């Protein structure tokens, strides 16, 4: 197996890892006031873009 010729410094290691973070998800608020992920139907009221797409009994 290949072995590194030089020890990787903490600075170089951390610079390489600078893009490895987890992005925070976008949150929008439904008409009912519930926070939801964009482009998804609301799980509490069942609406999407102002229309009822899921029955209230199912949601």
Swiss-Prot record:
GO molecular function, one term: structural constituent of ribosome
Segments for region (Disordered): 1-20
Composition bias, Basic residues: 1-19
GO cellular component, one term: large ribosomal subunit
A GO biological process held by the record: translation
Domain of life of the native organism: Bacteria
Record keywords: Ribonucleoprotein, Ribosomal protein
Pfam families: Ribosomal_L32p
Family as reported in the entry's similarity comment: Belongs to the bacterial ribosomal protein bL32 family.
The protein's name in its UniProt record: Large ribosomal subunit protein bL32
């Amino acid at each position: 197996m290949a072995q590194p010729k030089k020890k990787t410094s903490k600075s170089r290691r951390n610079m390489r890892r600078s893009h490895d973070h987890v992005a925070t998800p976008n949150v929008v608020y439904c008409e009912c006031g519930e926070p939801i992920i964009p482009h998804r139907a609301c799980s509490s009221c069942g609406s999407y873009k102002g229309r009822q797409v899921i029955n209230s009994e199912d949601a």
